């Protein structure tokens, strides 16, 4: 009987899939690449709990499985990492996994666990290039709790970058709030406008920046599913 089960396991498509993505970190590495990260340091920065040696192992594993390929870096130093067609096709798999957790484990999603720097990094990657102004605009984010931290997000040429040191540009708007509250907005648990109305997020600055800035963000890929879940369980 055991031999027969082993034979089926080697034939089962799900077994083949879990052999590729069936550990804690591999789906998250693929998530980062689906979000556009191609450089090792950027992927590592997005996964602060993962050691660099383990990331190296996971990338090599994915390359062996035909999910990732390496290209010479345009700078001539090192490589960049890119999803193959098979890797890109995992997007629907990961989205379904996220929707499952929202449906059945939503109460375990804890925004208070999110690190401020990781949140800012995620936010800057989820910027809508069609809405970001061409001219440079700097937004200062003052995290008031659990730790007081300040970051600057510079929007320019339809992209964004995050600074942990004041870049010295004129500030178009200042956002002040606890990290947890900003994480709730990013995840879709609460809308930006609702948070501003309630006073849990305070925004000041140039009127046109304050008004248009929320539309510059796409928020979490699962934000629409979270909003739907929240509305259904009110």
Model-derived segments and their meaning:
Residues 12-53:
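N-terminal helix-turn-helix DNA-binding core of bacterial DNA-binding proteins
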Residues 9-12, 177:
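Alpha-helix N-cap/N′ positions at the starts of helices
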Residues 7-8, 16-20, 59, 78:
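Basic, helix-initiating cap at the start of DNA-binding domains
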Residues 7-10, 112:
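Alpha-helix initiation/capping motif
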Residues 41-42, 50-234:
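Feature captures hydrophobic
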Residues 1-6:
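Short, intrinsically disordered or compositionally biased N-terminal tails of bacterial proteins
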């Amino acid at each position: 009987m055991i031999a027969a089960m082993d034979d089926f396991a080697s034939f089962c498509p799900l077994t083949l899939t879990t052999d590729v993505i069936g550990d804690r970190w591999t789906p998250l590495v693929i998530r980062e690449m689906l979000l556009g990260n191609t450089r090792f340091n950027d992927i590592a920065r997005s996964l602060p709990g993962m050691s660099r040696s383990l990331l190296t192992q996971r990338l090599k594993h994915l390359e062996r499985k035909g999910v990732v390929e390496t290209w010479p870096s345009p700078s001539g130093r090192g490589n960049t990492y890119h999803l193959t067609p098979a890797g890109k096709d995992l997007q629907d798999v990961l989205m379904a996994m996220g929707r499952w957790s929202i449906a059945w484990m939503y109460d375990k999603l804890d925004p208070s666990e999110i690190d401020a720097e990781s949140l800012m990094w995620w936010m800057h990657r989820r910027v809508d290039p069609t809405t970001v102004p061409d001219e440079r605009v700097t937004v200062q984010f003052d995290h008031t709790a659990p730790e007081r931290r300040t970051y600057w997000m510079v929007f320019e040429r339809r992209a964004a970058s995050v600074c942990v040191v004041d870049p010295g540009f004129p500030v178009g708007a200042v956002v002040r709030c606890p990290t947890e509250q900003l994480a709730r907005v990013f995840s879709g648990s609460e809308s930006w406008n609702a948070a501003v109305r309630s006073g849990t997020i305070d925004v000041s600055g140039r009127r046109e920046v304050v008004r248009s800035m929320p539309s510059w963000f796409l928020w979490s890929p699962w934000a629409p599913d979270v909003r739907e879940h929240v509305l259904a369980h009110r």
